[in-house]
Each structure stands twice: as C-alpha cells, then as structure tokens.
Amino acid sequence: MAAAPLLLLLLLVPVPLLPLLAQGPGGALGNRHAVYWNSSNQHLRREGYTVQVNVNDYLDIYCPHYNSSGPGGGAEQYVLYMVNLSGYRTCNASQGSKRWECNRQHASHSPIKFSEKFQRYSAFSLGYEFHAGQEYYYISTPTHNLHWKCLRMKVFVCCASTSHSGEKPVPTLPQFTMGPNVKINVLEDFEGENPQVPKLEKSISGTSPKREHLPLAVGIAFFLMTLLAS
C-alpha cells in the first residue's frame, strides 16, 4: 500500500525533472574511469600516460589483487601520491601528498578500489579541488624492492560545462553594446520626427466599461431567476 502514494507522486512529477531527480543531491552525474595500478599495466611504466576526465568524473584505482594461492611476500604493494610536475618527471614523492596505500593484496572476493572525484569544490576543508584545463599527477612508490619502481599517471581535467564545473560563466556582451566614449543619439535617427510611441488606454475615475453594464446584467439575471421560480 505504501507504493501507491509514491507512484502517484512520480506521475505528478513533470517528465523533464525525472533525470534531475535520478542524479541525486550531488547534481550532475559524472563518468567513471578505471585504472588497474600494478606493474603489468604497461601504460603506467612510461611517462606521458594521460587519462582525460571532465569535472565531476570519477577515477577508480584498483590495487593489485591475488587469490589465496598467489605469491606471498613478493606481492606488489604501493603507496600512491599526488605530486607536482617535477615530482612526476623524477618520480619523487618527497614533495607530494599521500593519497592511498595498496597494502591489502589478498582482500577477499575483489581488489581494493580507491576513487577520486574531480570536483570543482570540496565539502571538506582538507579536500582536493580540481579545475578544468589543469593537469594532475599521480605516482607510486613500492613498499618492496620491485623491478618497476616508478608507476605514474597524468590526469587532465577537460573543459566541462558550467553546470558541471560550478564556475560562473563569463557574460557575453550583446551585439548592440559599444565601448566607452561612444555617444548614441537615438532621436537623431528620426530627423526631427517624433517616434511613434504606443498610446496607453486609461480608465476614467477608475471605472471600466464593463462595470457600467453591471446593473443591467444583475437585473436580467434576477428576472430570469424569478421567471424560472414561477
């Protein structure tokens, strides 16, 4: 029985608003991009690998994962950092900030996943904020002496719409807007003739022509009611 009021409410909601309700309180929906962070991913072993995202997109980082029969002490474990361009090129995390740690390589059922949302504003004081048109850099350092010591990735936040990014749009000037020190003489275009201005009708003493016939209409209505009652 509780589903009936909900169904009635959905029927009353205009169709254009349904996609907005499906987005939830966060606003615009973003796409998800997946990267498997391990030495077998050859893209991470070379400089220049770039993932392009839009504002409000998600980047899912999947840590190395092994089943119970996999290797023990030789399993890959990484600490991921967000660094600047110099730290990205030299694979130096000393000036970076620690983001995630992949240290549960034998997690049950599925690999550990970390997600980064490229949002313009963060609700947390220490949260990360991302801007359209900027590049961000991620590297990792292994906790064991592995052959592939440097895994790195570049993320480019592409140009999203203003509704996604939350940034105020730059106002576009109308075509008739002119620069400073330009005088516009509107009346000179009429060469002395008065422009045709529409005339506004105004009721006298606040009475409308329809109100003048009101007593007659009331009298006719009263006459018809009397005739029907007889």
UniProtKB/Swiss-Prot annotation:
Lipid group attachment sites (GPI-anchor amidated glycine): 206
Primary location recorded for the protein, binned into one broad class: membrane
Propeptide: 207-230
Keyword check for Hydrolase: no
Expression by tissue: Expressed in myogenic progenitor cells.
Cystine residue pairs: 63-102, 91-150
Compartment annotation: Cell membrane
Single GO term (MF): ephrin receptor binding
Glycosylation sites: 38, 67, 84, 92
Any one of the GO BP annotations: ephrin receptor signaling pathway
Biological role: Cell surface GPI-bound ligand for Eph receptors, a family of receptor tyrosine kinases which are crucial for migration, repulsion and adhesion during neuronal, vascular and epithelial development. Binds promiscuously Eph receptors residing on adjacent cells, leading to contact-dependent bidirectional signaling into neighboring cells. The signaling pathway downstream of the receptor is referred to as forward signaling while the signaling pathway downstream of the ephrin ligand is referred to as reverse signaling.
Self-association state and partner proteins as the record states: Interacts with EPHA8; activates EPHA8.
PANTHER family according to UniProt: EPHRIN, EPHRIN-A3
The protein, known as: Ephrin-A3
Protein species of origin: Mus musculus (Mouse)
